[in-house]
Amino acid sequence: MARLNVKPTRMELSNLKNRLKTATRGHKLLKDKRDELMRRFVDLIRENNELRQTIEKELAANMKEFVLAKASENSLMVEELFAVPVHEVTLWIDIENIMSVNVPKFHVQSNTAREQEQGEFAYSYLSSNSEMDNTIQKTKELLEKLLRLAEVEKTCQLMADDIEKTRRRVNGLEYAIIPQLEETIHYIELKLEEAERASLVRIMKITS
């Protein structure tokens, strides 16, 4: 490791020791941050996998039920049932700070005013069968899970990026900056000791 190109003076030695102390403290803080991010990241990956499996399973089941329910209806009538959607939702995003990483928090709110005017679904109960009503309701209930999945996946992506950045900073301090400072400090201490010995020898020669 190449040492820093500085003059071997006591002032430089003091400055370098302060820099080393700061770098060592920063290294510990960054390692702690990386470890905590990794712990949360693993938890989120687990949640992501469980959510995805649940959603895919429920969507597949709902689609199967919907196809069966649709089979008993006239195709033109089914198209008319969904021609005018009335289910409206408001989506907004907040930002949450997790270990200095800004991640999204999705919120959804149903706008029930129009639904109350025209009925719960975009079609009439009188025109559809109960199986179709049931599958549509189940699909609506999946909305929050889908938003949570999107939230978790985006959070995982942002955390992964920050973990990589933090890892590079930790490695930079651990394998480059701190060793370089330590080697330079050692070099200056040796030079100062040599200068002190040389000065002592000169004094002894003068007094002898």
From Swiss-Prot:
It holds the Pfam family ATP-synt_D. One of its GO terms (biological process) is proton motive force-driven plasma membrane ATP synthesis. The keyword Transport applies. It comes from the Bacteria. GO terms for molecular function: ATP binding; proton-transporting ATP synthase activity, rotational mechanism; proton-transporting ATPase activity, rotational mechanism. The keyword ATP-binding does not apply. Keywords: ATP synthesis, Hydrogen ion transport, Ion transport, Transport. InterPro entries: V_ATPase_D (IPR002699). Belongs to the V-ATPase D subunit family. This is V-type ATP synthase subunit D. It comes from Streptococcus pyogenes serotype M5 (strain Manfredo).
